[in-house]
Curated annotation (Swiss-Prot):
The RNAP catalytic core consists of 2 alpha, 1 beta, 1 beta' and 1 omega subunit. When a sigma factor is associated with the core the holoenzyme is formed, which can initiate transcription. It catalyses: RNA(n) + a ribonucleoside 5'-triphosphate = RNA(n+1) + diphosphate. This is DNA-directed RNA polymerase subunit omega. InterPro entries: DNA-dir_RNA_pol_omega (IPR003716), Pol_omega/Rpo6/RPB6 (IPR006110), RPB6/omega-like_sf (IPR036161). It is an enzyme of class 2 (transferase). GO terms for cellular component: DNA-directed RNA polymerase complex. Keywords: DNA-directed RNA polymerase, Nucleotidyltransferase, Transcription, Transferase. GO terms for molecular function: DNA binding; DNA-directed RNA polymerase activity. One of its GO terms (biological process) is DNA-templated transcription. Promotes RNA polymerase assembly. Latches the N- and C-terminal regions of the beta' subunit thereby facilitating its interaction with the beta and alpha subunits. Belongs to the RNA polymerase subunit omega family.
Length: 67
């Protein structure tokens, strides 16, 4: 399991504050709504999965406009 760094995530969002908002929303979608992760689960917590999805470019700030 590779570590997720803030720098990896910041390539896909504007700043660290937006990163927190995007990661929080995506983690809740996975944990509460039961959405399927876009990356392999690897026995991680939903917050780590959300950060991995952001770092790999699967999730962007556009998620904030949903719902």
């Amino acid at each position: 399991m590779a570590r997720v760094t803030v720098e990896d995530c910041l390539e896909h969002v504007k700043n660290r504050f937006e990163l927190v908002m995007v990661a929080t929303k995506r983690a809740r979608q996975i944990a509460v709504r039961g959405d399927q992760p876009m990356v392999e689960w690897e026995n991680d917590k939903p917050t780590v999965v959300a950060l991995r999805e952001i770092a790999e470019g699967y999730v962007t700030a556009d998620i904030l406009d949903e719902d």
